[in-house]
Structure formats: C-alpha cells, structure tokens
C-alpha cells in the first residue's frame, strides 16, 4: 500500500491581506451570523488600540460600560495580537465561570480558542491544546493559572496577555502572593511569639481567647526579627509547605507583613512581587479590560506598570436606573418590609448578597438558591426562562447577565465582603489614605453588580439598596470618584426620589412606573438627568500626580523585595515629603520599612526612623533602641569594613561567603545584590554603582 501524501495539509503562513491583523477589518470576515456589526464605540476603541499598538505602545487600559461589549473587544484584541506576532496570546479571566463565558462569546463571534481551565475536578485541563501550541488559537485561562509559581505557561514564549476584569485582579494578585492560614494551632503558635509586644499584647490576648473582632498587624520590625522562627513553624505543616502561596513568599518572608485575627492568619507582601514575572517582560504586550473606572495609581502599585487609558465616550449609552435607598425611605422597618413583600413589589427580582448567611430571608419566599457552585448555572438558566420569581446568589457580583428583558429588577442586600486581612486592616487604620484599596475594590464590585440588569444602551432597571453599610457607602460623596458621571447622576436622582416615598404602596407604585416604562416616568427621568450639574471627577492632573507617587511606591517595594536595602532606604528618605503629604499612615509604614533597611545595613538611623513611625501610630511598633552613636556615613562604612574583613574565610560555605561579599559591597557604597538568589542565575554577587556599571 502506498501512503497518500496529498492528504497531508500544507502549513499555513501569514496571509498577504494587509488588513488580516486589523481587528476592525477582520471582524467582518469572521463567521458570526448572530452578530451583525460592531457598536460605534467598539469600533472606535479597537481602532484606537490598533493604531497605538502598531506604534509600539504597551500597557493599555480599556474601560467600557457594563453591557457595552467588553468581552468582544478583548477577544478581538487578543486575536489581532496572535495574528500579528504569530505567537502565543492568553486571555486571562478571574475564574473558570467567567472563562467559560468568554469561550461561549468567542464561538458566537467566530473566534477560535483553546482553554486551560478547571472544568472538572481540582486540576485545570486543556481543550484544543495543539492549536495553542501551534499559535493558531488564543488560550483562555485564569489569573491563578498564570500567576502561580508552577504555571504551565512560564516556560512558553507568551507574546500577549489580556487581563479581563482588571479591577478584580487587584485583589486576585494580592491573594496569590499571600499565605492564608486557618489552623488554630499555627495561629496560636505565631501569636504566642508576639504576645509581649507592648502595643498589641492586649489584642493578641483577645485573639487567643477567640474574640472575632480584633485584627492585628504584627509590628513590621518585630516580624522581621522573628521570621526564622516563623518559617520553622510554617514548614512543619505539610499542607503549607507544599502550597503554591508558600512558594511565592517563603524566600522573602522577612520582607512580608503579618495580620492576625481569631480565625485567620495572613502573611503577604505590601504589593505582589511580580517585577520579574514572565508576563511582565518587555516582550509581552499587555491590555487591561475593565467595566469600571479603576484608579490607575492602584493598578500601578499592584501591577508595577502605569497603563494609559483608551476611553471613548458613548453618546448612545442612556440606561434608566432607579436606585431605591432604604436609608432614605420615609417609613419604618423599610428593609424588613421590602424583603417580605418583594414578590408584590416586583414580579421578578435578582438578589445579590455578600454571604450565604444573608440569603436566609429569601428562602421563605421560595427563591432559587444554588446548593453549591456547580448548581449556579442551572439556577440561573431556570430563572431566565421563568416569568416571575426570585434568584438569590451570594458573592456573585460579576459575570451573571440578564440580557434582553430577562430581568429588570435588582436587589443588593449588604456591602460586599472583600479584600484580604491586609486590605481590611489598612482600611481601618489608614482611613485617610485617599485611594484605599478596599474602597476601590468595593466600588468595582458594586459597579459590576449594578450592571447585571443593565445590558444595553437603552436598558432599564430598578435597583434596591439594602443594608446600612451599603446605603452609607453608595451615598457617601467621597466615593463618587469611583463612579462614572452617568452612574453618579442616577444615584443622585435615586436619593431624591427615595426621600419622597412614605409607604409600601408608594414604593409599589414607583416601581410599577419604571418597570412599565410609562411616559410619566420617562419624562421625569429625562428632565432630572438634564437638570443635574456636571459631576466633578478626578482631574487628569491629579490622576497623573497620584500615578507618579504610585510609581515611587512600587519602586520602593521592588527594591525591598530584592533585598536592596541601602537603595530602598535612600529612596524612602528622598521622597518622604511627598509620601507624608499624601498619607501620614502610609508614611509610617514606609518609615517602618526604612527602619528594617537600617537594621540590615547596620545604619545608626534605625532608632530615629522607628521612633518616627511609632510617633505616627503605635501600630508600627516601639522604637528600636540603638547603643550606637550617630556617625557620618563615611565613618560608619570604615567601621563596618573593619568588622567585615574576618568574614572572608575560604572555609565557610559558598552561600555564606556570597552573602559576606554582598555586604562588603554595601559597606563600600555600591548597590549590591545576589542575582542567583533572586532567581536570575547569572551571577553569584553583583556590585553596581549609581550608573549601574
């Protein structure tokens, strides 16, 4: 039998079509019978991005209203990068659920994808892996699959990354570089080490007694001194020892921060140590997608890059949102009454709560409530097909869409639970830090939630706001900078209307007006929108100032993580005026880091800097008492040099010798580091002068 070579396909090269890489052009050549055209705003964004991309611009942030077709834009950009580079491009989602939705969207648009998702079981599995390996398809995956230290992608030549829902990634990145421990014995053992610490000993005692309220940050200098003992405790636990989070932080444990409550211990970095991560190499093109307006300075601190925005005004985006604030309603027990009469107020309502416990009131109403995560899609599908009823979900603020008249009534019951212990602690103690991560994350979740029942330019929805904390958060004027102007205008209108509602019957009547789309409602809403004064948001000048400071904070973090203590110290001191004017509590934190740098470099300023941190807030720990007298830097270096000479003994281990050689470089005034220890693998020890020679 002769083998038939004619059936072997010929390898495909790049087509000669000049528009083959242009997303606006090739969109019309894809097979998507259900999708007739791009929205004008989508076309403008894709054109803007492609023009910038061809000029070599990187790190672009694309912001688009919920329901505005963000996923299509992301997929088109990913496909454009794949075609242009003939390389591997990954589309990164917060979780598997959203990954599946992205794949379904890609099929509708005629875009071929591969995926690496946890579809069944505990481990992710491949679908269409050969297509991705041969650079013939974009791969849809999750943040965890990309960021974990054993990532299957880290040895691949990744050319492009789409970070979808970038507003959620702030929290996701933080968690990947944090160790969370709920083992009572470990919490007890670690807290025992610090139980005599003057400022926190009472709260440590309360934590050890099981009090759920106290939350403690171990003073950074005290934590730094005790990390060898901490490492022994954690390494004794096999689950922790073999965990991916521990792999991310164990070699830099002395540069982490620890937070303890009665039921949780959390160890993490100030900001994720991703400077040398493979997806942040210069050769990788990155795009960040968001349905909110995240602070770019937050993105800069967490990602270590400063994206520039691609934001196109959409004049056709005119949804009708009626916010009902129970805090403003003029009748008693309004929240209880709304919960008990929800079916009478609105025939069909989608309910979102922060926890499973908060779902309890809706069980008696016969609400569809999933029994587990696998049951979520089934319950959603049943609700979409129904003409009445309630769907109640816990902590599902994004990815659940109610398009095409599926549901026009949304109830959000309670402020979203979010953030790590670190974020919670910073929010409580650094409350005047103007761009608190917690506020930014909460805003992102709420904006996502508000968009669940608004899926088109001219859609409409009533949105009930329940819970004292949630009402206060949304009404608070200080949080308006997190909202786009059109959303904040609707919130202002809702506050005014809610103040006029004095009974359940009036609330029913009001809800009937918007859900029935009466002429009276439409005229009223349009007049109110047109009568509002323009909302002041963060100016570009102020945003750029915040970004500049965020870059400095990120550089401090990177130097600290690299154990480049001397340069880190000098950078903090050089910028202390700007840091202090921005936030005194944050300045206290950086003074604590500066004091640690002094400890590591035998700098006599450790007492002064730790005392200044303590003066800002005792949470940073008692001042370090130094028996050294202040000397000039030159005199200190001469003394340190004399002490260092006996360390150079060829009989010591290679690791010890390298560390001694690094310290000698510090003494002589060089920027000294150990590339091999940092994962570089090129040099054992490197001394650099100010010109990096």
Regions found by a protein language model. Give the residues of each.
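Acidic-basic catalytic patches of nuclease active cores, encompassing PD-(D/E)XK
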Residues: 363, 370, 636-676
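Conserved Walker A/P-loop ATP-binding site and its immediately adjacent core
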Residues: 71-120, 144-145, 292-299, 352-359
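Interdomain/boundary linker segments immediately adjacent to catalytic/signaling cores
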Residues: 601-653
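Conserved pre-motif I regulatory segment
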Residues: 4-63
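Inter-Walker segment of RecA-like/P-loop motor cores
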Residues: 100-101, 106-157, 377-383
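Conserved RecA-like P-loop NTPase helicase motor core
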Residues: 383-472
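Conserved coupling segment at the C-terminus of the helicase ATP-binding
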Residues: 27, 44, 50, 61-65, ...
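Long, largely alpha-helical accessory region at the distal end of helicase-like NTP-driven motors
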Residues: 456-582, 586
């Amino acid at each position: 039998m002769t083998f038939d070579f004619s059936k072997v396909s010929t390898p495909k090269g790049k087509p000669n079509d000049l528009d083959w890489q242009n997303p606006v052009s090739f969109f019309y050549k894809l097979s998507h019978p259900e999708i007739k055209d791009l929205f004008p705003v989508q076309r403008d964004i894709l054109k803007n991005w492609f023009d910038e991309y061809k000029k070599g611009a990187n790190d672009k942030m694309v912001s688009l209203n919920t329901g505005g077709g963000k996923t299509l834009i992301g997929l088109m950009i990913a496909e454009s990068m794949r075609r242009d580079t003939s390389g591997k491009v990954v589309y990164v989602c917060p979780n598997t659920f959203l990954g599946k939705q992205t794949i379904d969207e890609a099929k509708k648009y005629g875009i071929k994808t591969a995926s690496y998702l946890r579809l069944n079981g505990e481990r992710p599995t491949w679908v269409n892996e050969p297509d991705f390996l041969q650079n013939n398809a974009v791969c849809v995956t999750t943040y965890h699959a990309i960021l974990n230290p054993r990532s299957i992608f880290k040895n691949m030549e990744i050319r492009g990354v789409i970070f979808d829902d970038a507003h959620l990634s702030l929290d996701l990145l933080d968690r990947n570089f944090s160790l969370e421990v709920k083992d009572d014995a470990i919490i007890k053992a670690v807290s025992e080490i610090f139980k005599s610490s003057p400022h926190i000993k009472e709260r440590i005692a309360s934590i050890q007694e099981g009090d759920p309220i106290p939350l403690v940050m171990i003073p950074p200098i005290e934590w730094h001194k005790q990390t060898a003992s901490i490492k022994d405790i954690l390494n004794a636990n096999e689950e922790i020892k073999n965990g991916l989070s521990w792999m991310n932080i164990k070699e830099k444990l002395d540069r982490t921060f620890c937070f303890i409550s009665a039921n949780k211990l959390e160890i993490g970095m100030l900001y994720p140590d991703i400077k040398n991560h493979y997806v942040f190499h210069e050769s990788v093109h990155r795009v960040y997608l968001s349905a909110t307006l995240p602070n770019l300075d937050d993105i800069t601190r967490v990602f270590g890059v400063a994206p520039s925005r691609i934001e196109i005004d959409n004049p056709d985006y005119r949804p009708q949102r009626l916010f009902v604030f129970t805090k403003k309603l003029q009748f008693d027990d309004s929240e209880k009454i709304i919960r008990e009469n929800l079916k009478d107020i609105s025939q069909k309502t989608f309910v979102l709560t922060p926890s499973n416990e908060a779902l309890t009131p809706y069980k008696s109403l016969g609400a569809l409530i999933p029994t587990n995560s696998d049951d979520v899609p089934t319950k959603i599908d049943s609700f979409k097909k129904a003409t009445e009823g309630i769907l109640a979900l816990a902590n599902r603020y994004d990815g659940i869409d109610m398009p095409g008249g599926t549901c026009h009534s949304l109830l959000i019951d309670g402020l979203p639970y979010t953030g790590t212990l670190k974020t919670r602690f910073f929010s409580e103690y650094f409350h005047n830090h103007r761009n608190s991560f917690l506020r930014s994350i909460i805003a992102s979740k709420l904006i996502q939630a508000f968009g669940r029942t608004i899926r088109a330019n001219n859609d409409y929805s009533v949105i009930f706001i329940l819970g004292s904390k949630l009402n206060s958060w949304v009404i608070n004027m200080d949080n308006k900078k997190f909202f786009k102007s059109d959303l904040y205008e609707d919130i202002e209108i809702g506050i005014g209307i809610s103040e006029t509602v004095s009974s359940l019957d009036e609330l029913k009547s009001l809800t009937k007006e918007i859900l029935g789309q009466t002429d009276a409602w439409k005229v009223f809403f349009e007049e109110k929108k047109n009568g509002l004064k323009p909302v002041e948001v963060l100016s570009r000048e102020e945003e750029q100032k915040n970004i500049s400071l965020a870059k400095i904070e990120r550089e401090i973090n990177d130097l600290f993580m690299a154990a480049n203590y001397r340069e880190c110290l000098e950078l903090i001191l050089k910028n202390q005026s700007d840091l202090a004017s921005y936030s005194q509590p944050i300045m206290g934190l950086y003074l604590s880091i500066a004091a640690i740098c002094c400890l590591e470099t035998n700098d006599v300023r450790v007492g002064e800097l730790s005392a200044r941190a303590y003066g800002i807030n005792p949470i940073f720990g008692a001042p370090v008492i130094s028996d050294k007298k202040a000397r000039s830097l030159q005199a200190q270096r001469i003394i340190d040099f004399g002490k260092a000479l006996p360390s150079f003994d060829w009989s010591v281990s290679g690791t010890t010798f390298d560390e001694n050689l690094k310290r000698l470089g510090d003494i002589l005034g060089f920027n000294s580091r150990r590339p091999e220890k940092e994962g570089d693998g090129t040099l054992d020890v490197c001394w650099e002068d100010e010109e990096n020679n």
